[in-house]
Amino acid sequence: MSKGPGLFTDIGKKAKDLLTRDYNSDQKFSISTYSASGVALTSTALKKGGVHAADVATQYKYKNALFDVKIDTDSSVLTTVTLTEILPSTKAIASFKVPDYNSAKLEVQYFHDHATVTAAAALKQNPLIDITATLGSPVISFGAEAGYDTTSKTFTKYNAGISVTKPDACLSIILGDKGDSLKASYLHHFDEFKRTAAVGEVYRKFSTNENTITVGGLYAIDHSTAVKAKLNNHGTLGALLQHEVLPRSLVTVSSEIDTKALEKHPRFGLSLALKP
């Protein structure tokens, strides 16, 4: 693949991940195993409120093809096939879920040194079509996306964004919700290993005159333990502690509290991911 700009979905992703990844209010346990033949098997159990769910996912890579199959307790089977270099600098992703036969989807991604283009469509009679394009370089890129409903002949979305990326920082601005919202984020790393960072995000909803400002941070206590925290102008405070109990095996404890309504019970989450 080329070393050009990333996908449109990559714009603002690093800042979003620091503010959202690993924060949860559920109890989750997963264990992953790997065979000598290249098959990866992951079993996951989740308790959300009073609801229990589980799934088993398997992944197998053969030459330029990657096969993913996930079976859950709702008796649904999700299959995803990813093919790289089917044509030069091109990737194809096909997915479908059984028994929901209308869920079949095909996406094609093309990577160039100065542009990235994707097209995705649901494989049914009147599909939804999504198209994205990004121009630029790994340092600075401009992108746009649009979704079109062939049944109603209307656009379901059209958004645009810009991203500036340096080794120690990332800035992004996204005009979303058909021009009704604006999100700007900035992420800065303070060490070469990217284990300590600060992030800020400003979100503006024009139709409701709503503003949300969120700041967050990541700090590595040592090589196996890290803490994260975030706070927004609505008073929502989140924090988590993540510890590597074994190589590649993580335990994460997270919590969230409304500082403007301390009488409410805080929310707690626990996650254990084992990768022997």
Curated annotation (Swiss-Prot):
Induction details: By the bacterial pathogen P.syringae pv. tomato. Down-regulated by abscisic acid (ABA).
InterPro entries: Porin_dom_sf (IPR023614), Porin_Euk (IPR001925), Porin_Euk/Tom40 (IPR027246)
Principal cellular location given in the protein's record: mitochondrion
Entry keyword annotation includes Magnesium: no
Keywords: Growth regulation, Ion transport, Membrane, Mitochondrion, Mitochondrion outer membrane, Phosphoprotein, Porin, Transmembrane, Transmembrane beta strand, Transport
Tissue distribution: Expressed in root tips, steles, leaves, sepals, petals, stamen and pistils.
Residue(s) carrying Phosphothreonine: 236
Coiled coil: none
Location in or out of the cell: Mitochondrion outer membrane
GO cellular component, one term: pore complex
Function recorded in the entry: Forms a channel through the mitochondrial outer membrane that allows diffusion of small hydrophilic molecules. The channel adopts an open conformation at low or zero membrane potential and a closed conformation at potentials above 30-40 mV. The open state has a weak anion selectivity whereas the closed state is cation-selective. Involved in plant growth and development at the vegetative and reproductive stages. Is important for leaf and pollen development and mitochondrial membrane potential steady state. May be involved in ABA-mediated early seedling development and disease resistance.
Note: Plants silencing VDAC2 show an ABA-insensitive phenotype during early seedling development under ABA treatment.
Domains: entry comment: Consists mainly of membrane-spanning sided beta-sheets.
Protein name in UniProt: Mitochondrial outer membrane protein porin 2
